[in-house]
Amino acid sequence: MTILVTGATGNLGRLVIASLLERGADPQSIIAGARDVAKAEDLGVRAARLDYTDPSSIAAALDGVDSVLLVSGSEVGQRVAQHQAVIDAAKAAGVTKFVYTSAPKATTSDLVLAPEHKATEELIAASGLPAVILRNNWYTENYAADVARAAETGVLASGAGDGRVASASRKDFAEAAAVVLLEDGHIGQVYELGGDVAWNYTDLAGAIAEVTGRDVEYKPLTADEQLAGLQAAGLDEGTAGFVVALDAGIASGALSDTDGTLARLIGRPTTPLVDGLRSIA
């Protein structure tokens, strides 16, 4: 069985490949798909050029591949077309397992990130590919900038209100992807994956305080206050508005659900918030 991991030189892709190797996969059976193949040389597996914007590179990378992990692209607004190119190539190549990293409740969520993931899930379903959907909650590592800022100022400011986030470490999500790629019995499943504990931003402030050794206060912001603050910090209006919309989604509960599925897949508890933050502090 040959496994292709797209976005293999990114933060998640690297960890997926490491998890595959840790679970006994033959390095020669793994292909790291990357826009810049030179950056994949340290992964210890085969590498192939794969550029989401170059369909010919995708088709070549998929030649002879049995299973694909499509790590969702990072270019918001461009992802559906990029994902379509991979889906089409996988269908043409006769891929027998297609795994996609989606977003929580992608088909029903009002989270600003959800529409592109919903569209991608619909494309996968329409393709008829034997698929597994991994709806990943937030990565704890997403809060690296918040940790650094709070360590400097003693304040965690956000528009997330009392919303809860069932985050886990990237390694947790990467292990789940490796399990699904290597094991039988997952085709047709849509897994909602999150950490064992859904925490709020008061909890986050406390966790940051624990790892930084200084008091940290959570300061809730209105949407207007947050938008003004982000623009004052140098963000353009579009980017600032996107961040505000993300936090509004958190406030509404878009990231709060957790049912233990991630822990069951990886065979251990998910990484606690404090431990995840300690790795990036």
Predicted regions mapped to residue ranges:
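Short-chain dehydrogenase/reductase
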Residues: D36, A40-G44
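Conserved beta-strand segments of the P-loop GTPase G domain that flank and frequently precede/overlap
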Residues: V71
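Oxidoreductase cofactor-interface core, primarily capturing Rossmann-like NAD(P)-dependent enzymes
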Residues: T2-V37, T53-A59, D63-V65, S74-Q84, ...
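Rossmann-fold cofactor-recognition segment
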Residues: G44-D54
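Contiguous, function-dense segments enriched for cysteine-driven chemistry
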Residues: I31-R35, D51, A89, P269-A281
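A hydrophobic C-terminal alpha-helical subdomain
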Residues: D224-A281
